UniProtKB/Swiss-Prot annotation:
Disulphide linkage map: none
Domain of life: Viruses
Keywords assigned by UniProt, alphabetized: Calcium, Capsid protein, Intermediate capsid protein, Metal-binding, Ubl conjugation, Virion, Zinc
List of residues binding Ca(2+): 266, 286
The protein's name in its UniProt record: Intermediate capsid protein VP6
Binding, Zn(2+): 153
Role noted for this protein: Intermediate capsid protein that self assembles to form an icosahedral capsid with a T=13 symmetry, which consists of 230 trimers of VP6, with channels at each of its five-fold vertices. This capsid constitutes the middle concentric layer of the viral mature particle. The innermost VP2 capsid and the intermediate VP6 capsid remain intact following cell entry to protect the dsRNA from degradation and to prevent unfavorable antiviral responses in the host cell during all the replication cycle of the virus.
Post-translational events: The N-terminus is blocked. Sumoylated with SUMO1 and SUMO2. Sumoylation of viral proteins seems to have a positive role on viral replication.
Positions of region (Interaction with the inner capsid protein VP2): 62-73
Subunit architecture: Homotrimer. Interacts with the inner capsid protein VP2. Interacts with the outer capsid glycoprotein VP7. Interacts with the outer capsid protein VP5*.
Protein family per UniProt: Belongs to the rotavirus VP6 family.
């Protein structure tokens, strides 16, 4: 993996900097590195593909070295270099696609394609010029079963979940009380509602709670907490739990009271925030517990009192909500990230070449299913293919 990264980094630099008119002295170190790569690769044969519709390709390396010059690089020099660069880029691209198409239930962190296994040999270590990538560093750590630490911005840590629970209901569905939520990606939105606006509740107050368990521990997280859940601020028709009928939800939004958010690790509270909104932080956690209250307004103007009558029918439904969004965090496991293209790159390659469903990844790389059942085998394989995708992204956009 280190060799593949070094190849890609060298080729990217060569493609960007070995251009007509450039002073040789400005790129002499890069050309020496490029020649070292050629010397190491010459005389070796590789094969890629042969899975799904990814065609089998044979690669033979027998290239001349780039020479020296006292002046600027001319057109002939650059054309010779480009021929070599393009062949190497095509090779790296195919090795990456071959690797992304493969998976294994055992030791999925290790190279799975024949080409990358061969590149892992001792004879190619002379190409190991640079391993400064976060993915490469953490792949090396995970390969040695040591602690990793990926920094994600908007990590897709929450499997998609859109549902509700009813604490009070009846067949007519005309006086409900409960909680509705939407968890997805890096965001939680939860709303508590009461058709009667806590009319007969103790102290005219309804208490709501929403608990979310993460599939992996997050650390040093920066989080935004807002006293609103905009996705639950408009009327909708909701299917009943048994699917036999539907019920009407017509929210009127109130501000939540006594808001508390707790971040827990192995059942122990690590951080707690009460009535604090905006930017908050959490040290390390695997569970989030949100609690908040809906209080019937003690003093209401006639217009507000008309919204919340003292008897049925309850046409308008009192609603309070919260939004919690993880803006950035560190995780020991690799995750999809809204700011990165790794998941999209891997999925597109597997779809384009009709890679058959294997023993590890779900069909279509379904992220909700993958993160819901995030086994060690999936974690190993995902870290490997995301690392390869990061390498490929240097050369292929």
């Amino acid at each position: 993996m280190d060799v593949l990264f070094s190849l890609s980094k060298t080729l990217k630099d060569a493609r960007d900097k070995i251009v007509e008119g450039t002073l040789y002295s400005n790129v002499s170190d890069l050309i020496q590195q490029f020649n070292q790569m050629i010397v190491t690769m010459n005389g070796n044969d590789f094969q890629t593909g042969g899975i799904g519709n990814l065609p089998v390709r044979n690669w033979n390396f027998d290239f001349g070295l780039l020479g020296t010059t006292l002046l600027n690089l001319d057109a002939n020099y650059v054309e010779t270099a480009r021929t070599t660069i393009n062949y190497f880029v095509d090779f790296v691209d195919n090795v990456c696609m071959d690797e992304m198409a493969r998976e294994s239930q055992r030791n999925g962190i290790a190279p799975q394609s024949d080409a990358l296994r061969k590149l892992s040999g001792i004879r190619f270590k002379r190409i190991n010029f640079d391993n400064s990538s976060e993915y490469i560093e953490n792949w090396n750590l995970q390969n040695r079963r040591q602690r990793t630490g990926f920094t994600f911005h908007k990590p897709n840590i929450f499997p998609y979940s859109f549902s509700f629970t009813l604490n009070r209901s009846q067949p007519q569905h005309d006086n409900l009380m409960g909680t509705m939520w939407l968890n997805a990606g890096s965001e939680i939105q939860v709303a508590g509602f009461d058709y009667s606006c806590a009319l007969n509740a103790p102290a005219n107050t309804q208490q709501f709670e929403h608990i979310v368990q993460l599939r992996r521990v997050l650390t040093t997280a920066t989080i935004t907490l807002l006293p609103d859940a905009e996705r639950f601020g408009f009327p909708r028709v909701v299917n009943s739990a048994d699917g036999a009928t539907t019920w009407y939800f017509n929210p009127v939004v109130l501000r939540p009271n006594n808001v508390e958010v707790e971040f827990l690790l192995n059942g122990q509270i690590i951080n707690t925030y009460q009535a604090r909104f905006g930017t908050i932080t959490a040290r390390n956690f695997d569970t989030i517990r949100l609690s908040f209250q809906l209080m019937r307004p003690p003093n209401m103007t006639p217009a507000v009192a008309a919204l919340f009558p003292n008897a049925q029918p309850f046409v308008h439904h009192a609603t309070v909500g919260l939004t919690l969004r993880i803006d950035s965090a560190v995780c020991e496991s690799v995750l999809a990230d809204a700011n990165e293209t790794m998941l999209a790159n891997v999925t597109s390659v597997r779809q384009e070449y009709a890679v058959p469903v294997g023993p590890v990844f779900p069909p279509g790389m379904n992220w909700t299913e993958l993160i819901t059942n995030y086994s060690p085998s999936r974690e190993d394989n995902l870290q490997r293919v995301f690392t390869v995708a990061s390498i490929r992204s240097m050369l292929v956009k």
